[in-house]
């Protein structure tokens, strides 16, 4: 169905129990190679898909475990592009920098910086620190598909945290010293450091949500309220112009986000009826050409050469390297009662999309925009859209073997049980 989000420029109240689940899912993000940072990229590859009907920003490639930030920036770029018809190249590195800073400054770090997270964390970071274009943070990576700077910064910061100045700065809770060490790890130039200081202070005495309520921060930093988006007010509402602040809403200690247009996490149920109900909500959002974030568990032995995640293949090969992941749901393929196959990437009429909401509809796969790069012959030979993957519902429903702590188990008996790969979706209010 042509409800997906394409046109690529470049070639990853909640209950307390769900909060615990989200925290465990935030342990890291899967990347398509053991060490993506070891693979050089010139960022020049590109692909366009002219069949699809909704604008999406370009595919990028994560080099560390921050898929959730790549997914969130893809989401906000698509929302913005729907309103402006222009493509922002926002900086995942910017949000990554602040994610590390908050861990260090708040004493929430062990022997290494945690790279994993989830949507709620990303939304809070955006509200506090805004977004910047990549060219205004890491200039050398303004057009790069993959950020090597993130990988080198993580290595440098962890070394300093282990036995260098960062270890002492964290122990003293010296925010200015923590920022100074992060600036060095990220190899920020003097002009970039000065602009950050001007807005937030050397010791981060200010954040956008508190100090810049009535005035723009300037210095290339955009508040969420400065980023226009286009979105529908609920499934039966009208398309309206809004801002990214409306979509991120306001967080709470319970994990829910408040606001008329706020997106919230919706867990994937365990029963068939509940699953179909949630999938219908996802379909409605995609029908309205709005991107949907989704969290799922990757097992790379399920990845086929044509960019599918297949339960049949996983059952043949047994469990492999695996981990949590977040991507942007983009399109789906389904068999619809009375109609037959609605194929991904092909135009569907309003009547067909309405029929696809029937209880008896069988979704075959969900197509996602990923953060593993566009052209990856080392991992797959072909894909319907470069950089996108088709997650078969049989795989997402599972169950699959759960092997915590085993990077690539050679003995399935090491696995402690089973897990449902599909974890949750992030949906707008009213759906």
Regions found by a protein language model. Give the residues of each.
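N-terminal Sec signal peptide cleavage junction
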Residues: 26-29
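Conserved catalytic-core surface of thiol
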Residues: 335, 340-431
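Short, low-complexity, disordered segments immediately C-terminal to signal peptides
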Residues: 33-46
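Active-site nucleophile-adjacent alpha helix/oxyanion-hole segment immediately C-terminal to the catalytic cysteine
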Residues: 43-238, 242-247, 280-288, 292, ...
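Extended, basic/helix-rich recognition subdomains
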Residues: 248, 257, 306-307
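Active-site-adjacent substructure of cysteine-protease-like catalytic cores
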Residues: 166-169, 266-367, 430
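Processing junctions and N-termini across compartments
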Residues: 20-23, 61
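Bacterial N-terminal signal peptides that target proteins for export
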Residues: 2-17
